[in-house]
Amino acid sequence: GDPLITPTLPAPALLPRAINQPMAGGTDTDAPQVLEQLAVADQQWRPRAEPLPGGGTRYVYRKRPGDPDLSLNQIKALMLNPPTFSRERQVIDQLWRRLVQLGVRLELTQPRKVGAAGEWDPARVTLRIKPAVVDKGSREFARVLNHEAIHVAQSCQAGGTRAQPQPLGLPQQLPPQLRNVLQEPTYDRATAREQTLEREAYANQEQLELGLSLLNLHC
């Protein structure tokens, strides 16, 4: 019979949050250690073929919310040439090192806000990323780190890493999947300025090289 194709969704995408109050605790981590953990997590994005008890084959692959379904030919092509996430890993390494150069402390720890993937705390010059983001692999981690790096650049624009962030004047057109993100309860008490800061970061987080450019320009 025809092969079965089974896409599986990872856990709901974690949305970065930023500019929260300080939270004690957390552990410093270095880039090589994180990249090592991400290399393991990236294996989940390799499609696999599973033999069925009655004969035939089932092809299983993971997809992110909003991604189109893959055809059998596309799945087989991915199995022959699995994603390396080399661009994402390079971005993570460069961003991480630049942030450390700027005196930013990076912690893999639970952010203060429930459900947050990441947060930038200028008062403590600390950037926190939820450990579960590592489990999602390099693509998601690069996106979250880039989002938070944009917030760091917003602080630099205001005078330095310890300054309260100010808008950079970036485009604020949100992609369809994030169109309602600022209507979540998390942002109920956000000021107009805070909404603008978040809109800038969300609208540009997919431009993975942008965070580093903004840090170099403003910090």
Where are these regions (language model features)?
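Bacterial Sec-dependent signal peptides at the C-terminal "C-region" and cleavage site
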Residues: 1-4, 12-13
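Metalloprotease/metallohydrolase-associated module, dominated by Zn2+-dependent proteases
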Residues: 3, 102-104, 112, 164-219
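Auxiliary, metal-adjacent structural segments of Zn-dependent hydrolase domains
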Residues: 4-7, 18, 28-125
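Extracytoplasmic/secreted proteins, especially bacterial periplasmic and envelope-associated proteins
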Residues: 90, 94, 140, 144, ...
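A mature extracytoplasmic/lumenal domain signature
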Residues: 110-112, 131-133, 156-159
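Short alpha-helical hairpin
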Residues: 118-127, 174-182
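Short pre-active-site segment immediately N-terminal to the catalytic Zn-binding motif
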Residues: 128-145
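Catalytic Zn2+-binding segment of zinc metalloproteases
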Residues: 149-167
